[in-house]
Amino acid sequence: MVYLLCPALLLLMSGCESEVFLSGQPEEGNSSDGKVRVEIFARANTYPLPLTKGLEDENTVGMAPWVLVFKGNDANATFIEAAQAFELAGKRYVILTRQPAGSNYRLLILANPQQFFYYGDAVTAYSFTSENFRLNMTPEVTTLSDICSRLLTEPLNAPSCTVIPYSGAGELIPMSYLLTVDKIDNTTKIENTDKSSLQLVRAVAKMVITNKAPNFEFPRL
């Protein structure tokens, strides 16, 4: 059995971050300067096949994903804010600005982010900081579609034919999920409507090829 892991270009989406400090987190059920604490329920989407040989861990979801908030129903939804989640008592939380009912909001969850992102090209690398997000995106102007087409993951440092992406020690696969909610307040939870955890989508595609012939070779994709 031969396992191939093909890197796919992940269109990450991001925006201005409200930096969160543990000392300033509002208690559950309360607000601080219009902010609310929202719990995140998420896990990696399950493969129906065995784990890929060579990967340290292809199912782990880190405890500090980014959550990007957009107002609207579709790709033209406009960016509101972005914040990085934090771990508290073994759970994931994120501090978001309260948003009233009456409109739809799209939450883009970006888990296991890399050290850098690229915006518009693969030349200039930006670390994940609020300042760098503000250099590239404008609240209430930049759309979900804009970010989909411009914000990218780090390019591979070596040809994928010789190095399996995200196979290094402690190197987690970037994952994402797009969720729609009708408000953001202290009752909001980032989960499915049936209360189950979101099944995040990995930034790479996995192909499993089975051939029992002793002389089988798979030349390329």
Predicted regions and their residues:
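Bacterial N-terminal signal peptides
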Residues: 3-14
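Sec-type signal peptide cleavage vicinity
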Residues: 16-221
